[in-house]
Amino acid sequence: MDLTPTLDAIRVFCEERDWRQFHNPKDLTAALSIEVAELMECFLWKKADELTLTIEQNRSNIEAEIADIAIYLFHLVEVLQIDLPAAIDHKLEHNRKKYPIEKSRGNAKKYTDL
């Protein structure tokens, strides 16, 4: 998946509106958190057996909220000059040690409870 055109589009969108002045790490993080909360709201009070229908009926809104999350996350990564693939690789390696397969496979417990 080549995200370069998407990342460029996000950058251009913000530059055209002169929004970089507002996009500091604190505010981008707050915006990201708010968008995650809006995604959570799509599923609020739904029982497990209602989720399939909820997703089907609200797919466009769910997609829009996920897009908002991605936009703010990618913009935050750019502002902080983070190599996201490298950060993900590092975090996965860290989590491999915390969640060894033999203890965590099929288990939802936190690493401190394994």
PLM-predicted stretches and their roles:
Residues 1-66, 70-114:
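Flexible "arm" and connector segments at domain edges
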